[in-house]
């Protein structure tokens, strides 16, 4: 893990309120480094300083944000005007707010991998690279596995203890 000893946040704040949501963001790593836009898992998760451990913080500028209704982002109504398209647009608004014009690496895991792929599809001109882990595509079969079949892992594991 590259960032383990150097995952200090150098900038944090909120995007200006839009549609009743204030989006929390933070940046870590090299302020002049290659920009990486990180999408956390969930839905309902949040960005954590430990997510910096996935990156080379001496060379990369890692931008993280708490999605609408998550973590330190603020809203009166976490459901209203909170959908996948808006989450992707919020990510683009964040890059604009931070004056990041060059293509970025998008990264994410689980639900974050879904959002990273949707971001790349919506804004292909903004993409330098895509880095995904624990990929979740939010297809019907993925939902069925998550809600029903994933329990098989626990049953199998318990049988071997």
Outline where the language-model segments fall.
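Conserved HGGG/HGGXW glycine-rich cap/lid loop of the alpha/beta-hydrolase fold
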Residues: 17-75
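A catalytic-pocket lid/entrance helix-loop region that shapes and gates access to the active site
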Residues: 127-158
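Conserved acidic catalytic loop of the alpha/beta-hydrolase fold
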Residues: 86-104
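Catalytic nucleophile-loop/oxyanion-hole region of alpha/beta-hydrolase
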Residues: 74-88, 141-149
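N-terminal cap/lid segment of alpha/beta-hydrolase-fold proteins
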Residues: 2-22
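Conserved alpha/beta-hydrolase "nucleophile elbow" surrounding the catalytic nucleophile
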Residues: 108-110
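Short glycine-enriched nucleophile-adjacent loop
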Residues: 113-124
């Amino acid at each position: 893990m590259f960032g383990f000893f150097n995952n200090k946040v150098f900038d944090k704040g909120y995007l200006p309120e839009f549609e009743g949501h204030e989006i929390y963001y933070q940046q870590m790593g090299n302020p002049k480094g290659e920009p990486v836009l990180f999408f956390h898992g969930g839905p309902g998760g949040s960005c954590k300083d430990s997510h910096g451990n996935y990156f080379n913080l001496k060379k990369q500028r890692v931008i993280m944000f708490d999605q609408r209704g998550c973590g330190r982002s603020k809203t009166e109504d976490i459901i209203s005007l909170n959908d996948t398209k808006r989450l992707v647009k919020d990510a683009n608004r964040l890059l604009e707010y931070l004056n990041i014009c060059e293509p970025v690496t998008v990264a994410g895991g689980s639900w974050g991998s879904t959002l990273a792929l949707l971001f790349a599809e919506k804004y292909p001109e903004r993409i330098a690279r895509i880095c995904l882990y624990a990929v979740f595509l939010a297809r019907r079969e993925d939902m069925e596995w998550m809600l029903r079949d994933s329990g098989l892992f626990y049953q199998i594991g318990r049988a071997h203890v």
